[in-house]
């Protein structure tokens, strides 16, 4: 989903007209002239200033390998459905990489492939993008790795490469990762339990089980239990999870593009991350191989 400022007046008018005439709505159509006048009166992005640019996903259709890139995007959005033999829980890539990896501070894919191969402290060696993706399959999705040369792995890499655009290895990409949170804060899991009940349970369930629709399909992912990420996942670390929560959760309560995400204080984010990251979840047997050379982070679960 592109940033609001990237859309033409005509495109915004078409979107608004569609919404106003769909799902039982009976509003009149909006034309480009009306949008132009309104844009002159308001700042398109009057939230926090950022140089992060969300790619226009429709543009991938012009890529010479468009079919492969689209397959890669679908694999990130529908991972469990398309790769059931490799996903061992109820998560998809987009559970952590929001909006198919297009959200600033939501672990976006924008520019990422330019930085691989790179040294990974947890692995203690230089790894390629395929190995990094398989780390997510084994940890965040508690599943099995894809063969690096398989068509599906190469489709996922192709999607990353398309998202790279003109990024160079030496560049700094705004919005990369999950943002920052004050690392000096002391977690209070009891307050975290209260924050979870107040801000998170409505989507992720009172017992962290996630939320399904009437057809049994998972709408919001489970945060603990057998169907969630294992202890080897980055999201099982308090301060990694806290930074993600701080910048991306809850959704729908703010004006931040594109999901209305964020709003918790640093302390509440740290507390709720401490609470849910330490709930029961699957083990990761290969944890004994992690950080063979570098210092283990203090918030690691093992």
Predicted region positions:
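Flexible coil segments in periplasmic/lumen-exposed cytochrome c-class electron-transfer proteins
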Residues: 2-66, 70, 90-91, 116-123, ...
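Generic structural signal for alpha-helix termini and adjacent loop/cap motifs
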Residues: 21-25, 78-82, 139, 163-166, ...
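Sequence/structural segment immediately N-terminal to covalent heme-attachment motifs in c-type
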Residues: 64-100, 183-220, 238
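Juxtamembrane/interfacial segments around transmembrane helices
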Residues: 143-145, 244-252
């Amino acid at each position: 989903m592109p940033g609001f400022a990237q859309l033409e007046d005509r495109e915004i008018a078409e979107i608004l007209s569609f919404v106003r005439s769909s799902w039982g709505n009976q509003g009149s159509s909006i034309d480009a002239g009306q949008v132009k006048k309104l844009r002159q009166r308001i700042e398109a992005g009057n939230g926090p200033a950022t140089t992060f640019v969300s790619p226009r996903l429709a543009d991938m259709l012009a890529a010479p390998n468009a079919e492969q890139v689209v397959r890669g995007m679908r694999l990130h959005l529908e991972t469990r459905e398309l790769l059931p033999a490799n996903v061992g829980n109820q998560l998809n890539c987009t559970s952590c990489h929001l909006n198919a990896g297009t959200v600033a501070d939501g672990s976006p894919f924008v520019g990422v492939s330019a930085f691989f191969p790179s040294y990974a402290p947890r692995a203690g060696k230089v790894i390629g993008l395929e190995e990094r993706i398989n780390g997510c399959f084994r940890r965040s999705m508690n599943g099995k790795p894809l063969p690096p040369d398989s068509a599906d792995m190469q489709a996922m890499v192709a999607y990353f490469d398309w998202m790279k655009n003109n990024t160079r290895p030496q560049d700094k990409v705004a919005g990369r990762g999950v943002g920052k949170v004050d690392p000096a804060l002391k977690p209070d899991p009891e307050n975290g339990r209260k924050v979870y009940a107040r801000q998170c349970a409505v989507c992720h369930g009172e017992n962290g089980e996630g939320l399904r629709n009437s057809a049994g399909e998972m709408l919001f992912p489970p945060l603990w239990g057998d169907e969630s990420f294992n202890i080897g996942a980055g999201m099982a670390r308090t301060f990694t999870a806290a930074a993600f929560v701080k910048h991306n959760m809850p959704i729908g309560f703010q004006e931040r593009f594109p999901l209305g995400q964020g709003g918790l204080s640093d302390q509440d984010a740290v507390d709720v991350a401490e609470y849910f990251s330490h709930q029961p979840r699957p083990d990761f047997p290969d944890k004994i191989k992690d950080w063979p050379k570098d210092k283990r982070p203090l918030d690691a679960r093992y």
